[in-house]
């Protein structure tokens, strides 16, 4: 049942495929019903955060999972989106809900500018540069007058009860998570998806066979940055406050990478598996250890998974189903005449 749920796309039209998609629909209906009738503030808030991270992880998955570019800078564009909407409200009185698309476009434009030099790098060099850029943008936000420095920017809270606010963002992030997951699924089965996988497997060979690798990477990066920027704008309105240290926290990028790597990079199901797992473990560790120790633990987890479970949970499931199918195919038929 577990494999049917997370691998519904195999054997299209088969009974197991239909059952897998039916289970996903049932889960979505259950989440919608809980959003309507649930009254536990903590659960609504926690699930809203899960949905928000699902969106960020799916966005990271475009270039990081399918393209194989390990990016530790997703929080940079999340923060740019958050600050864009906060600045537009603070100086011009514009609503975050109206400026969310503008925040996404601003983050995408920043992603294009940063991507022009950085996407020519590969491997550890690219990963290191994305980390440096995150800290550089954080320092910039601390120093600039328009961002109000370390004080940050306050935004008016919505005229709703705390339960009403969390219910609103529960549905906003759930809807966005569904939309982005469907988008990633469509890209995975498109020419762009195949091009990204070709880049991940062998970028030089992909160029030789005609894949326009630079343009594909720029497009995937810009789309990922746009999504992160919109999420950042919604997050800013949710907490009604942005400041450099928390908004550009490196832990956010680290969590996103962990969620994708543990769930299964390069699959649309990976973020749906990895996000709740990482958040659950992170909450447990937060009670026991300091944030510095947590970073060390998570870094070790990434290394172990990269070395011994490169496909994450989805990789394990896919290999198990493949072995199961092979064993069934090799079993001699019991029907003899």
Where are these regions (language model features)?
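Transmembrane alpha-helices and adjacent helix-loop boundaries
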Residues: 1-337
């Amino acid at each position: 049942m577990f494999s049917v749920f997370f691998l519904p796309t195999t054997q299209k039209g088969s009974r197991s495929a239909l059952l897998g998609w039916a289970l996903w629909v049932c889960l979505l209906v259950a989440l919608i019903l809980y959003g309507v009738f649930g009254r536990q503030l903590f659960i609504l808030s926690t699930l809203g955060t899960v949905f928000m991270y699902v969106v960020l992880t799916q966005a990271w998955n475009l270039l990081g999972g399918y393209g194989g570019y390990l990016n530790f800078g997703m929080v940079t564009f999340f923060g740019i989106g958050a600050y864009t909407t906060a600045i537009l409200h603070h100086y011009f009185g514009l609503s975050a809900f109206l400026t969310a698309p503008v925040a996404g476009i601003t983050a995408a434009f920043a992603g294009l500018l940063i991507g022009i030099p950085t996407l020519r790098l590969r491997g550890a060099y690219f990963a290191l540069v994305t980390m440096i850029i995150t800290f550089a943008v954080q320092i910039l936000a601390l120093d600039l007058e328009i961002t109000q420095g370390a004080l940050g920017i306050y935004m008016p809270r919505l005229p709703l009860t705390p339960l009403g606010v969390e219910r609103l963002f529960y549905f906003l992030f759930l809807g966005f998570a569904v939309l982005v997951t469907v988008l990633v699924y469509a890209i995975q089965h498109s020419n762009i998806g195949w091009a990204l996988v070709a880049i991940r497997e062998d970028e030089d060979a992909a160029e030789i066979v005609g894949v326009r690798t630079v343009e594909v990477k720029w497009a995937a990066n810009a789309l990922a940055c746009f999504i992160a920027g919109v999420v950042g704008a919604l997050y800013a309105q949710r907490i009604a406050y942005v400041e450099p240290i928390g908004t550009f926290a490196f832990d956010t990028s680290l969590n996103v990478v962990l969620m994708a790597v543990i769930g299964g990079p390069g699959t649309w199901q990976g973020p749906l598996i990895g996000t709740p797992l990482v958040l659950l473990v992170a909450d447990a560790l937060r009670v026991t250890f300091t944030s510095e120790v947590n970073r060390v633990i998570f870094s070790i987890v990434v290394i172990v998974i990269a070395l011994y479970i490169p496909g994450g949970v989805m990789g394990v499931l896919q290999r198990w189903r493949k072995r199961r199918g092979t064993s069934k195919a090799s079993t001699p038929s019991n029907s003899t005449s």
